[in-house]
């Protein structure tokens, strides 16, 4: 009887750990760049490209390509979410308001921008912890290497892949994924 109780307890605790580990992209709430709460569950049924961005980086011109990608595919259940972060070389020093003005004025950004967060280190945002840790996303460890690293999330909220910061938003990997090829 003790053996059965032990096995049952072990089984139930394993199930609890697995559900806690892979709670899914859609379970997170984030803050928009203008301070509103946004539930990622609103994106169920859409492919999502998550990208950490910075205004004073050599890769900042990717904003233009990201906007072009968004314009091309936004009517095909695709969305981009930008997360400003100041983790690399202090290249995103501005306030949320300053970042929003910069993106709109210089690149015409209309894809959703979120409030500035940390994408690595001790103060990493919960969403980025999930994006970067296999134990949580169930797929792969993918530490953010620099500004403009991209994560691909499918319609069900499952982690699909990541794309290195220097790769174009129009890389074959991203476009093929969006188009379902």
Residue ranges and their predicted role:
Residues 129, 133-181:
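Thiol-/selenol-based redox modules, centered on thioredoxin-like
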Residues 18-41, 125-126:
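N-terminal "domain-start" segment that seeds a small globular fold
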Residues 46-47, 56, 60-84, 104-107:
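Conserved helix-turn-beta segment immediately C-terminal to the redox Cys motif
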Residues 32, 52-56:
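Amphipathic alpha-helical repeat scaffolds
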Residues 24-25, 97-146:
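Short, internal strand/loop/helix patches
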Residues 77-94, 110-121:
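Thiol-based oxidoreductase modules, predominantly thioredoxin-like and allied folds used
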Residues 1-23:
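Bacterial Sec-dependent N-terminal signal peptides
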């Amino acid at each position: 009887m003790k053996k059965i109780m032990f096995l049952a307890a072990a089984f139930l605790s394993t199930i609890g750990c697995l559900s806690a580990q892979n709670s899914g992209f859609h379970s997170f709430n984030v803050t928009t760049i203008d301070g509103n709460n946004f539930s990622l569950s609103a994106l169920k049924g859409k492919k999502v490209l998550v990208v950490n961005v910075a205004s004073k980086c050599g890769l900042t011109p990717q904003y233009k390509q990201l906007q072009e990608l968004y314009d091309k595919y936004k009517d095909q259940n695709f969305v981009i979410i930008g997360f400003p972060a100041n983790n690399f070389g202090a290249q995103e020093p501005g306030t949320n308001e300053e970042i929003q003005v910069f993106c709109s004025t210089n690149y015409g950004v209309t894809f959703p921008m979120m409030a500035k967060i940390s994408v690595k280190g001790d103060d990493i945002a919960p969403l980025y912890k999930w994006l970067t840790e296999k134990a949580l996303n169930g797929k792969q460890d993918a530490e953010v290497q620099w500004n403009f690293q991209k994560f691909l999330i499918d319609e069900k909220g499952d982690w699909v892949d990541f794309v290195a910061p220097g790769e174009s938003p129009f890389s074959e990997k991203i476009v093929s994924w969006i188009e379902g090829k």
